Amino acid sequence: MYDILDLYEEPYDPKRPIVNVDEKPKQLLGDKRKSIPMRPGCSEKYDYEYIRKGTANIFVAVEIKAGKRFTQVTKRRTMKDFAVFIQKLVDEEYPDAEVIRIIADNLNTHKIKSFYKTFSEDEANRILSKIEFHYTPKHSSWLNAAEIEINIMDVECIGRRIGDIETLSDRNLFTHPIYAVR
């Protein structure tokens, strides 16, 4: 626990960002009947019946001190999906970082073996040379800021019926601003 708290106390360093990572499953639900649109004084009305359309997974990475959030929607939550998400962070979001310090829970997909099972040994070593994992202790997921961000996203944009992965993937769903804390 103190390892995580010590990281949070460090000053912001763009060359050594602290990035919280987590994921959330999302059940895809469609409307059995068309909803009644909202009008002045009345909210949108939905029928209680729905159609199950499968599930999806939302990966979330949050760099609180820089005010950044990255999301990726996948059909499943596998070791490969996690490794590809982290590779994208390393290559596209933090290409100039010396090391990305990732705070994650102890889920089995959040381990180093995910990279070796997904990529060639050289590629896995390249990615892992740029990241440093810090794991939250058991029963301490509240230490991971990505958990809090997922809750905010749930309340503000995904805590409603979403019937397909394309709608869920739409970046406009994830427009809640992150305020930099330094």
Residue ranges of each PLM-predicted region?
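Active-site proximal helix-loop segment of RNase H-like, two-metal nucleases, encompassing DDE(D)
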Residues: K138, A146-I165, I178-R182
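Short catalytic/ligand-binding loop motif for oxyanion handling, primarily in non-cytosolic enzymes
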Residues: Q27-L29, T109-I112, W142-A145
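Mobile genetic element proteins and their domesticated derivatives, centered on retroelements
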Residues: N20-D22, A61, G67, I86, ...
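Short, conserved catalytic or adaptor-binding loops enriched in Gly and charged residues
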Residues: D122-L128
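Acidic/histidine-rich, metal-coordinating catalytic segments
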Residues: A97-K111
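Extended, low-complexity cationic-aromatic segments
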Residues: M1-Q87
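Short, basic/hydrophobic alpha-helical segments
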Residues: D81-R101
